[in-house]
Curated annotation (Swiss-Prot):
Single GO MF annotation: hydrolase activity, acting on glycosyl bonds
Induction trigger: Its transcription is positively regulated by Vfr, the virulence factor regulator, in a cAMP-dependent manner. Constitutes an operon together with PA2782. Is expressed only during biofilm growth.
Catalysis performed (reactions): Cleavage of Xaa-|-Asp, Xaa-|-Glu and Xaa-|-cysteic acid bonds
Main location class: secreted
Cofactor binding comment, as recorded: Binds 1 zinc ion per subunit.
Post-translational modification: Made as a membrane-associated pre-pro-protein, which is exported to the periplasm with removal of the signal peptide, leading to a protein with a molecular mass of 65 kDa, that likely contains the metzincin domain plus tandem carbohydrate-binding domains. Undergoes processing during export to the extracellular milieu, probably by autocatalysis, yielding a (mature length) 25 kDa protein that most likely corresponds to the metzincin domain only.
Protein residues bound to Zn(2+): H164, H168, H174
Listed name of the protein: Peptidyl-Asp metalloendopeptidase
Swiss-Prot/TrEMBL cofactor(s): Zn(2+)
Native source species: Pseudomonas aeruginosa (strain ATCC 15692 / DSM 22644 / CIP 104116 / JCM 14847 / LMG 12228 / 1C / PRS 101 / PAO1)
Record-listed E.C. numbers: 3.4.24.33
Gene3D superfamilies named in the record: Collagenase (Catalytic Domain), Galactose-binding domain-like
Described purpose of this protein according to its UniProt entry: Metalloprotease with endopeptidase activity. Specifically cleaves on the N-terminal side of aspartyl, glutamyl and cysteic acid residues. Mep72 appears to be a secreted biofilm-specific regulator that affects the processing of a very specific subset of virulence factors exported by the type III secretion machinery as well as flagellar proteins. Binds directly to ExoS and PcrV and affects the processing of these proteins in the biofilm secretome, but contrary to expectation, Mep72 seems to protect these targets against proteolytic processing/degradation.
Length: 599
């Protein structure tokens, strides 16, 4: 099911052509307490992992050049959005704590797992998501598409629901047949989605793809693919899984993948597998990645050092390796020469109390997969290790990405126990990479939502994620005022165009902010240009307004500093778009070192 919002006419940058390497779309998944009380949601971590795996498998087999990456999951217990309804989706999207979490983890898409809604006549509503839209066949999202990339998934429905609702956020509709029944072809209504062909497909009585409703085609068969007329598969009754210029969700997604992956700047570092290419020392000149502190009972579960960790039998060599791209994030490489366990002794726990054990694991050997286990192990008086399945977790793990293992349990000590360990191992004794190990009391307060940052800054050294063109295209450029990179707004169609980014979830209502940015127009051969910045703000109970942040006339080809100050009104913020613009549309505009400081 979809839900459309009226989008502004601000346009995002033209999507680049589909790349061979899939684009990474970061997703945050929250879940309600009630969802965990259902058969499908009792092991909510496994359910979320299955959602991601189903979607990514469908993308891969369909030919879609993007993959979902789970950057955060958390129980939502500060508000009640119990079922899949439009009202709950709207409230969820506008929840300030959800918005802050989205910014903290840089989630391009945000999902809430709750319960389905009885919609009458024997039907239930399994999911609902806002439709990411743009001008028809333009290849550009409207400016607020990134701000409405939220969806709800009923835990009591199938795994395909999650991929379906994320598809709406990415600009996909249901099917041609369902478009005929809705207002899509009614000229009184604006275009919905990205392209006319950005939709699912089905054949009467045979099958429907992920975005199409099977009952609209008189079938129960849902092929686990996105519509692609170039794909012929038995799941599609040995027929094409789409129709050229009619139903081609894969073509639409590949065209928009870069924009979707840039809905928000990346906050959780990407990871690599240095273990597969031999031991790789942590580069000393890289800055540490910015990550939330784990706390808990294991001390340094982020592995700034190896203190306390050892191989139980001495059959493995331990070393620290960097697993991040562009910053420093240690993981522990467990290079096993014979079967062994990675262990760390811990202080005695309270019998009968609840604890949560978690960590991330990847196999050293790329393109391999096997079962990895994480557990509390008790050492008995005779030196033997006792294993309790209730205090352990297992997961099929690959050598291509980190997988998170997590288990909540009530602690029960073994008889004649003399020592207690946290342990990690693979069933075959394969070498592992381990990170973010944590053991904490289950009754501990849930992860806190951080306050709005005092400083918001963009230096574009890691790219222009989260930024887009305003009636222009946007890209990273080496024409920078400082450092290596800046943002270039080019192919500007009008005067008063440039680039923008959403600040929703980063601003605190009622506060004053000082703004500054380095700006430049042209290459030195043109005339002077006016540069200026606005904060477009929509807050509860007030109409949308453009709050000026400053203006300056600049010499062509020269960098100048644009400065100003703004007082935000009180009340919940519904939309906040920072826009930096200029005249002389025939020239590129360059932007660098953007900053807002809370005063």
């Amino acid at each position: 099911m979809k839900k459309s919002l009226l989008c502004s006419t601000l346009a995002l940058a033209v999507a680049s052509a589909a790349q061979a390497a899939p684009k990474t779309v970061d997703i945050m998944v929250l879940y309600t307490p009630a969802a965990t009380q259902t058969a499908n949601g009792r092991d909510i971590d496994a359910r979320i992992a299955s959602y991601i795996e189903f979607a990514n498998t469908a993308y891969e087999k369909s030919g879609v050049n993007l993959r979902l990456r789970l950057v955060h999951k958390q129980r939502l217990d500060w508000a009640d959005y119990p079922t899949v309804t439009g009202a709950n989706l709207d409230r969820f999207m506008r929840d300030p704590q959800v918005q802050r979490l989205r910014e903290q983890y840089g989630a391009d898409l945000v999902s809430l797992v709750n319960r389905s809604q009885n919609s009458g006549n024997g039907y239930i509503t399994c999911g609902i998501g806002y439709m990411g839209s743009g001008d028809k066949n333009s290849g550009r999202f409207h400016g607020n598409a990134k701000d409405i990339a939220y969806n709800l998934t009923g835990v009591d429905c199938g795994l395909n629901t999650f991929a379906h609702e994320a598809g709406h956020n990415m600009g996909l509709r249901h099917s041609y047949e369902q478009d005929l029944e809705s207002s899509y072809y009614d000229p009184r209504y604006a275009h919905s989605g990205t392209y006319e062909w950005s939709r699912g497909y089905g054949v009467q009585g045979r099958f429907a793809t992920v975005m199409a409703y099977p009952h609209a085609f008189g079938t129960n068969k849902q092929a686990p693919f996105f519509a692609n007329p170039r794909l012929v598969n038995a799941e599609c009754a040995n027929q094409p899984c789409g129709r050229e210029e009619h139903a081609d969700a894969v073509r639409a997604l590949n065209s928009m993948a870069t924009q979707i992956a840039d809905f928000r700047p990346t906050k959780v570092p990407g990871t690599v597998n240095p273990g597969s290419g031999g031991d790789t020392p942590t580069p000393p000149d890289l800055p540490w990645c910015t990550k939330a502190k784990l706390g808990g009972l294991l001390g340094d579960g982020e592995f700034a050092s190896m203190e306390g960790w050892r191989a139980w039998s001495g059959n493995a060599q331990l070393s620290l390796v960097n697993v991040a791209k562009g910053c420093r994030d240690n993981a522990l490489l467990v290079d096993v020469r014979g079967f062994d366990l990675l262990v760390r002794p811990i202080a005695p726990l309270r019998a009968g109390s609840g604890y949560r054990l978690s960590g991330k694991v990847m196999l050293k050997a790329a393109n391999t997969r096997e079962t990895v286990r994480m557990a509390l192990l008790s050492e008995r008086a005779d030196g033997a290790l006792a294993y309790n399945p209730a205090q352990s977790v297992e997961l099929s793990v690959s050598g291509n990405e980190f997988s998170r293992l997590e288990k909540t349990f009530d602690y029960r000590p073994a008889a004649d126990q003399r020592n207690l360990y946290v342990a990690v191992w693979s069933d075959s004794g394969a070498s592992l990479l381990v990170d973010e190990m944590n053991l904490q009391e289950a009754q501990a307060a849930p992860p806190s939502v951080p306050p709005a940052p005092k400083r918001i800054a963009y230096d574009f050294e890691s790219g222009i994620g989260g930024w887009s063109g305003v009636h222009a295209s946007a890209r990273a450029t080496r024409v920078a005022s400082a450092g290596r990179l800046a943002l270039e707004a080019y192919q500007r169609r009008y005067a008063g165009t440039g680039a923008s980014t959403s600040l929703l979830g980063n601003l605190e209502a009622g506060r004053t902010y000082a703004f500054s940015a380095d700006v430049r127009v042209g290459d030195g051969r043109g005339s002077q240009a006016m540069t200026y910045a606005y904060l477009y703000l929509e807050s509860q109970g007030r109409p949308g307004e453009y709050l000026p942040l400053g203006y300056k006339v600049v010499e062509n080809g020269r960098w100048a500093s644009l400065r100003g100050q703004v007082q935000l009104p009180k009340g919940p913020i519904k939309r906040a778009e920072l826009m930096i613009l200029s005249g002389n549309q025939q020239e590129s505009m360059f932007i660098d070192n953007v900053q807002l400081l809370q005063k």
